[in-house]
């Protein structure tokens, strides 16, 4: 190879290396590492900057602000109560360094003079059913189990359907596994978010499609369809939300969601071929829709949810002498920080009632995470998904 060819090859290698490291070009496991020293497009600073030692630097240019603080899921694993203040420099740039943090994804906001907002310099932000927040991705030495690895990938299709229940157009996302065969009947997991989530949050925050791809590649789960369902069927701040949402959601499943999925995909169209699961409010939908609809579902995943008065709200299910015969799998999970706090009162109330009536279930508590996406991703990968359809 002559000198010109060698120089060209080296230049090409450098160019390709730089190209591969650009944020938002590839589905990188370390998109906030700042490998090129470039400021994100339309931003004025690099924030957050995630270092290989798992420390994180946040920056905000706000010369007229009187206070800036960090609020987010990382404070739970740090054992910090309340927000973490920034320090203001003479140049008007506020800075905060935290960590090292465990490898994970964290949601956060900045609190500027008492006003909570997404980080204006962070290109990773959530699209959700509540005011937006920013994403912090603390990387390890390579792709994690929630990342897009070099494995066969399934597909996610967004469908729009008309609901006679809500009398409008609604969306549903359906994951099909790698090597999906439209002639083969698959079991279906119907997966829901919480009070502030949209179906797409299970992909972008929950990474459920990548988690499922990786579990299948590792031989740890059964191939299945996953329907990401919009369980926002009445405004969350409606004064009768708690009284109406469960009945409306049951109708939505019976009259719209399940008929749509069964008519567009080849499914195992019986209770043993269906699972229902959700986080927080979606976990309560799982309880108060799913456990009251044993003609539809036989598998249940209750994530970060429960009830203080299950004898009244779930009396028919609890007193059914054939409940264990009708239920293939009942999973209950929460984060370690949740188990020590407010949310555990409902979870414990639900578990105590199940124990009293001899109803079988599996309980799974993960790490020191709180009421956030870190908990729900971990519960899917380590707990719920590997156990589905194994009975």
Question: Which residues are covered by each model-predicted region?
Answer:
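Bacterial Sec-dependent N-terminal signal peptides
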Residues: 1-23
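Non-catalytic cap/lid and distal C-terminal segments of serine-dependent acyl enzymes
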Residues: 21-39, 43-81, 88-391
């Amino acid at each position: 190879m002559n000198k010109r060819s060698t120089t060209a090859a080296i230049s090409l290698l450098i160019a390709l290396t730089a190209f591969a490291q650009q944020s938002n070009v590839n589905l990188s496991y370390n998109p906030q590492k700042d490998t090129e020293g470039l400021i994100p497009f339309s931003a004025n600073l690099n924030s957050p900057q995630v270092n290989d030692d798992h420390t994180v630097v946040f920056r905000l240019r706000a010369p007229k602000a009187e206070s800036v603080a960090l609020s987010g899921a990382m404070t739970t694993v740090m054992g910090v109560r309340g927000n973490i203040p920034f320090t203001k420099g003479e140049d008007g740039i506020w800075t905060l360094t935290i960590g090292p943090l465990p490898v994970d994804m964290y949601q956060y906001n900045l609190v500027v003079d008492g006003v909570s907002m997404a980080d204006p310099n962070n290109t990773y932000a959530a699209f959700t059913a509540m005011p937006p927040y920013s994403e912090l991705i603390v990387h390890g030495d390579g792709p994690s189990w929630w990342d897009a690895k070099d494995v066969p990938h399934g597909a996610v299709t967004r469908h729009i359907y008309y609901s006679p229940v809500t009398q409008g157009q609604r969306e549903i996302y359906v994951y099909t596994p790698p090597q999906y065969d439209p002639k083969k009947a698959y079991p279906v997991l119907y997966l829901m978010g919480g009070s502030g989530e949209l179906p797409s949050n299970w992909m972008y925050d929950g990474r459920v499609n990548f988690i499922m791809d990786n579990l299948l590649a590792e031989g740890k789960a059964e191939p299945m369809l996953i329907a990401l369902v919009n369980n926002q069927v009445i405004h969350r701040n409606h004064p009768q939300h708690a009284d109406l949402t469960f009945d409306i959601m049951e109708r939505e499943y019976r009259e719209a969601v399940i008929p749509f999925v069964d008519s567009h995909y080849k499914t195992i169209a019986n209770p043993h071929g269906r699972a229902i699961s959700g986080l927080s409010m979606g976990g309560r939908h799982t309880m108060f829709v799913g456990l009251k609809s044993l003609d539809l579902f036989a598998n249940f995943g209750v994530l970060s949810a429960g009830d203080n008065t299950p004898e009244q709200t779930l009396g028919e299910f609890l007193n059914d002498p054939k409940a264990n015969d009708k239920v293939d799998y009942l999973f209950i999970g929460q984060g370690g920080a949740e188990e020590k706090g407010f949310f555990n009162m409902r979870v414990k109330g639900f578990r105590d009632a199940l124990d009293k009536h001899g109803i079988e279930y599996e309980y799974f508590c993960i790490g020191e995470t709180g009421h956030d996406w870190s908990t729900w991703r971990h519960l899917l990968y380590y707990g719920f998904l590997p156990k589905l359809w194994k009975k």
